[in-house]
Design a protein with these regions (language model features):
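Acetyl-CoA-dependent GNAT
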Residues: 5, 9-13, 20-96, 101, ...
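Acyl-donor-binding surface of acyltransferase catalytic domains
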Residues: 1-3, 147, 153-164
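Conserved beta-strand-loop-alpha-helix junction that forms the acyl-donor binding cleft
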Residues: 105, 130-142, 161-164
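Flexible, glycine-rich phosphate/dinucleotide-binding loops
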Residues: 16, 91, 137-138, 160
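Residue-level signal for alpha-helical context at structural boundaries
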Residues: 36-40, 132, 147, 164
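Conserved acetyl-CoA-binding loop-helix of GNAT-fold acetyltransferases
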Residues: 100, 106-119, 144, 148
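Conserved active-site alpha-helix within GNAT-family acetyltransferase domains
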Residues: 111, 123, 127, 135-155
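Short helix-adjacent coil turns
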Residues: 13-14, 108
Length: 164
């Protein structure tokens, strides 16, 4: 983790900033998806993607959620967030929705955040950690950060679209 970073648990007043980070970090991803599938399909299949992701973040930040959410502060500013889940039966932990604000990417914050998350998973008794990400060019920075944190074995997955 880089100097001056602090990781702490999510607090309710953090949600607006996490939504800002999510929107900024995922903008190129949604743009890439629209380019890949084409405008005709995107208008139907992806029309609610940003709103659905915003709702997902709101949901996983609820006190009743099964997700643990933490934030990364650089100085007094929240610059990243990550969610994790623990499956005690299978001993598999998952890094879920996460993002580093684009203004702070490329500084090792993501890698440090994932290493911290992996330490949490180990401490909770997990034996395996998983994370899902896209295979398109817009996800390349995330893939690199996951690989730096030690992820390697991957099962490829492809979503196919067509107009009807």
């Amino acid at each position: 983790m880089i100097e001056n970073c602090n990781i702490r648990g999510f607090e309710r007043q953090d949600l607006a900033r996490l939504q800002e980070i999510r929107a900024a970090a995922y903008e190129p991803v949604f743009e890439s998806f629209r380019r890949i599938v084409g405008e005709k399909i995107a208008q139907v299949a992806l029309s609610n993607s940003e709103r659905e992701q915003a709702e997902l973040l709101r949901h996983i930040c609820e006190a009743t959620s099964s997700h643990d959410v933490f934030v990364v502060e650089l100085g007094s500013e929240i610059v990243a967030f990550c969610s994790v889940t623990f499956d005690q039966a299978s001993k598999v932990g998952e890094i879920g929705l996460n993002a580093v604000h684009p203004d702070f990417q490329g500084r090792g914050i993501g890698t440090g955040m994932y290493e911290w998350a992996l330490d949490r998973l180990r401490a909770a008794g997990m034996h395996v950690a998983t994370v899902g990400t896209g295979g398109d060019p817009s996800h390349a920075p995330a893939r690199r950060a996951y690989e730096k944190a030690g992820f390697g074995a991957a099962i490829p997955s492809v979503y196919l679209y067509r107009s009807l």
